[in-house]
UniProtKB/Swiss-Prot annotation:
The chain crosses the membrane at residues 130-150, 155-175. It holds the Pfam family TM2. InterPro entries: TM2, TM2D1-3-like. This is TM2 domain-containing protein 1. The gene is Tm2d1.
Length: 208
């Protein structure tokens, strides 16, 4: 004989069908969401090595040309240095192949800025302006013969022009006439002018 269900309680088999249907729908929906999430994670595209975050790679210091004091192979104001993804990082290398790095393989080449120099030394220009500026030697050296001759004939504009030129050359405001930059020690004191125009490229932040 089957035991009687206590009075006042509904039998599980006699429970409302809506509750069972709701539980089943929730279970099925959760299963579909989990499968979709797993598929999204598994199907995530491997990033390019140049898109790695800071700290996920390390780049070598550029090799400096002793004569120009600029990175070797500087072309169009740009040079490239080798960068190595950290161990256990997987990304697409230079050839587009998905590679699991160990820390010793080159992942990508990072562009760095460099300057166009044409043989004009900053130290020489400052020295000429300080000691022979009243003769216009600094202006002759930088490729301004007319101003150099004028300073020579006026003894550096009575010294005032020599002082002004010394300040302008020391602050790297006046440079070579051909538009090139001074040869300055790569890790020395350099003046960098920053400006933003309508043509300035703003790189989109790819991660928070």
């Amino acid at each position: 004989m089957a035991a009687a269900w206590p009075a006042g309680r509904a039998s599980p088999a006699a429970g409302p069908p809506g509750l069972l249907r709701t539980l089943w729908l929730v279970t099925v929906a959760a299963g579909h969401c989990g499968a979709a999430a797993s598929g999204a994670v598994g199907g995530e595209e491997t990033p390019k090595c140049e898109d790695l975050r800071v700290g996920q790679y390390i780049c070598k210091e550029p090799k400096i040309n002793d004569a120009t004091q600029e990175p070797v192979n500087c072309t169009n104001y740009t040079a490239h240095v080798q960068c190595f993804p950290a161990p256990k990082i997987t990304c697409k290398d230079l050839s587009g192949n998905e590679t699991h790095f160990t820390g010793s393989e080159v992942g990508f080449l990072k562009p760095i800025s460099c300057r166009n120099v044409n043989g004009y030394s900053y130290k020489v220009a400052v020295a000429l302006s300080l000691f022979l500026g009243w003769l216009g030697a600094d202006r002759f050296y930088l490729g301004y013969p007319a101003l150099g001759l004028l300073k020579f004939c006026t003894v550096g504009f009575c010294g005032i022009g020599s002082l002004i030129d010394f300040i302008l050359i020391s602050m790297q405001i006046v440079g070579p006439s051909d538009g090139s930059s001074y040869i300055i020690d790569y890790y020395g004191t350099r003046l960098t002018r920053l400006s933003i125009t309508n043509e300035t490229f703003r790189k989109t932040q790819l991660y928070p």
